[in-house]
């Protein structure tokens, strides 16, 4: 017998992702599969360039802006490739030919992030917790950011080791970039204090397959270079 969508037969998933979706969301998706917004097209059949699908994107962006209090001059993007793709895409767009980035390495995901960014430009660990087995995150004052760093990258919550920032990391006045995949919308996040926020959807936002990226006017100007 198939598990009931009413909850009694559903299995709870304690994995870090994909996340369990609310029954209301699952039911709404089920209704949209054969007929999206009374368009006559199913959700998986409708053109991604159509007005009816654009309304889905617009609604998602409006909710992201409202829930996260995204400043009006920031851009909200829904991209492919997962959060891991942003490890090097962020560096590729923000560092340029001679850029530098400093990283706070607090777990496995931030290790992966600095490794990928190192393929693009000059990166260094301003703080690295690997020597102690990643049992903590740094306090402000435990590290020094290079004067010529273009930005500072950190991972808000490393699920592999359970190291989570409960404060806004000091960036030495440099733009902040954060991988917020595993706690976005779960804890307060001041978007205006960051110039690029990215998060894979499957842990806190929804099903896998899309990455949320929020970028500031400064980041847009760097990408333009």
For each feature predicted by the language model, list its residue ranges.
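Conserved N-terminal alpha-helix of the aminotransferase class I/II PLP-enzyme fold
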Residues: 40-86, 93, 107-108, 116
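Conserved PLP-enzyme active-site core in the AAT-like
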Residues: 15, 19, 23, 78, ...
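A glycine-/small-polar-enriched, mobile loop at the entrance of the PLP active site in fold-type I
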Residues: 10-61
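Generic hydrophobic-segment detector
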Residues: 6-7, 59, 72, 196-199
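Basic/polar N-terminal segments that are highly enriched at the extreme N-terminus
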Residues: 1-10
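Generic secondary-structure signature for well-ordered alpha-helical cores
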Residues: 31-38, 62, 66-70, 119-122, ...
């Amino acid at each position: 017998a198939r598990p009931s969508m009413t909850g009694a037969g559903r299995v709870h998933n304690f994995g870090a992702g994909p996340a369990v979706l609310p029954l209301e969301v699952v039911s709404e998706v089920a209704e949209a599969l054969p007929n999206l917004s009374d368009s006559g097209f199913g959700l998986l059949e409708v053109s991604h360039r159509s007005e009816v699908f654009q309304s889905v994107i617009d609604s998602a962006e409006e909710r992201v802006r409202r829930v996260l209090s995204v400043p009006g001059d920031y851009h909200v993007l829904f991209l492919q490739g997962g959060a891991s793709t942003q490890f090097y895409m962020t560096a590729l767009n923000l560092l340029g030919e001679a850029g530098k980035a400093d990283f706070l390495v607090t777990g496995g995901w931030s290790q992966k992030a600095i490794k990928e960014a190192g393929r693009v430009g000059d990166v260094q660990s301003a703080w690295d917790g690997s020597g102690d087995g990643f049992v903590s995150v740094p306090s402000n004052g435990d590290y020094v950011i290079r004067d010529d760093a273009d930005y500072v990258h950190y991972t808000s919550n490393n699920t592999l080791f359970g190291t989570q920032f409960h404060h806004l990391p000091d960036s030495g006045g440099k733009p902040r970039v954060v991988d917020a995949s595993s706690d976005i919308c779960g804890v307060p996040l001041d978007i205006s204090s960051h110039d690029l926020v990215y998060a894979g959807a499957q842990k806190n936002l929804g099903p896998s397959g899309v990455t949320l990226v929020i970028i500031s006017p400064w980041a847009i100007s760097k990408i333009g270079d």
